[in-house]
Amino acid sequence: MFLNSLDLPGPPENSRVVVAMSGGVDSSVVAGLLKREGYDVVGITLQLYDHGAATHRAGACCAGQDIEDARRVAETLRIPYYVLDYESRFREAVIDPFAESYARGETPIPCVACNQTVKFADLLVTARELGADALATGHYIRSVSYGTHRALFRPLDSERDQSYFLFATTQEQIDYLRFPLGNLPKARVREIAKEMGLTVADKHDSQDICFVPQGKYSDVIAKLRPEASNPGDIVHINGQILGQHSGIINYTVGQRRGIGVATGEALYVIFLDVENARVIVGPREMLETHKLFLRDVNWLGDERLENFPSDCIDVAAKIRSTRPPRPARLYYKEGIFSVDLLEGESSVAPGQACVFYNESGDGARVLGGGFITHSERSTDAEERLQRVLHN
C-alpha cells in the first residue's frame, strides 16, 4: 500500500490534516509544509486565555495577538482557519490544577497538563469530527511507525527537544498525531518561514507558562488560592527560625536566590511544610537524592505492566526539560513506579516530571513518564528533616 509522507494511505490530496496553530513560527511552518505537499489542511487555534498584558507580551501563546498572527498565516497559505473558545476548559484543566499544585508545595508543569487534556484530547476529538486523518502540531519530537503502532523519539534538534512535555500522550493519541518538525533544526524552520513569506518568521518563541502575565506566577496563584500567600516562618534544618516569608507560593524546592534571609551560609529551600506554612532551608547536600517515586505514570514501553520485570529496566531518565537523559533504573512493584538515578540529582521538587527513554542518545525513544511525589534523601538528611517537621 502506498503511504504518503505522514504514513497515511494514498496521495496527500486524499488526506485531511488539522494543524494546531498557536500563532508561532513552528506550527505555521507545519501548516505551510503540509499545504505545499498537497494535503487538505485545516488550521485551528484554541483561544485558551485572555490575560490583559499577557495577550501582547513577547512569548505569550494562544492569546489575542497570536490568534491574529495565525489568521494572517492561514490567509497567506490559503487554508481554512477556525478559532475555538477553550478559555473555560483551559482554566478547569490547566490553570486551576496549576494553582492547587503550587498551594500544595509542588512545582507543577502546566504544559504537560495542557498537552494531556486540551491539545491532545479535546482538539483531537474536534479534528476527528472534521473528518481529519491526522492532527499535526509544531512540537519538536519525532513520531515513527513502530510495529503496529507509532512511537515517540527525541528530535533531530536536541536543543529544541520537547519530548519531556509529551510523555503523557496516550498510545491512541500518538497514532493519530503527526510532528513534521521532528527531523528539522529550528534554524531551517525559520528559513522555510521566510521562503513562504510568513509574517511570523522572526517571531519570538513561546514561553513555558503561557498564561502567566510578565512571568509572575505567584500573582495568578494568589488570586486563585489566596491561602497560599499566608505568611510563615523560614526555618533552618537545625530548627532555628531565621525569618518570615510572605507565602509558600514564592518558593520552590531547590531555590537559592530570593529566600529572604542572610546568614553567611549558602542556603537552599529543602522542603515546603504546607500544613504549617513553613519554608525549611539548609545546605545543598540536603537536596541530593538517588531515588524518586512517581504517580500518574504513562507507560509507553513494549512490556505490558503485568509482565514488567521483577527486578528493573535499564532506562535513561530526564527530570528537567533542559537536561539530557541520564542513566537510571526503573522499578514497578505493587502498582508503584520508582526510579534509581545512577548519577544522582539535586533539587528535585514534587510535581516535576520524570521521563523515561530507552537510551541517553539524541535519537532515544520515549518510554513514558510520571510526576514525582517525593524523593529519597540520605538517611541523615531525612532524619534531620523529620525532626524539624515534628517540632
Swiss-Prot record:
Active site as annotated: 114, 210
Location in or out of the cell: Cytoplasm
Known catalytic reactions: S-sulfanyl-L-cysteinyl-[protein] + uridine(34) in tRNA + AH2 + ATP = 2-thiouridine(34) in tRNA + L-cysteinyl-[protein] + A + AMP + diphosphate + H(+)
Gene Ontology CC entries for this record: cytoplasm
Sequence segments annotated as region (Interaction with tRNA): 160-162
Top-rank taxon, per record: Bacteria
Any single biological process term in GO: tRNA wobble position uridine thiolation
Entry-linked CDD domains: MnmA_TRMU-like (cd01998)
Top-level EC class: transferase
Disulfide bonds: 114-210
Keywords: ATP-binding, Cytoplasm, Disulfide bond, Nucleotide-binding, RNA-binding, Transferase, tRNA processing, tRNA-binding
Site feature location: Interaction with tRNA: 139, 352
Major localisation: cytoplasm
Keyword Chaperone on entry: no
Protein's recorded name: tRNA-specific 2-thiouridylase MnmA
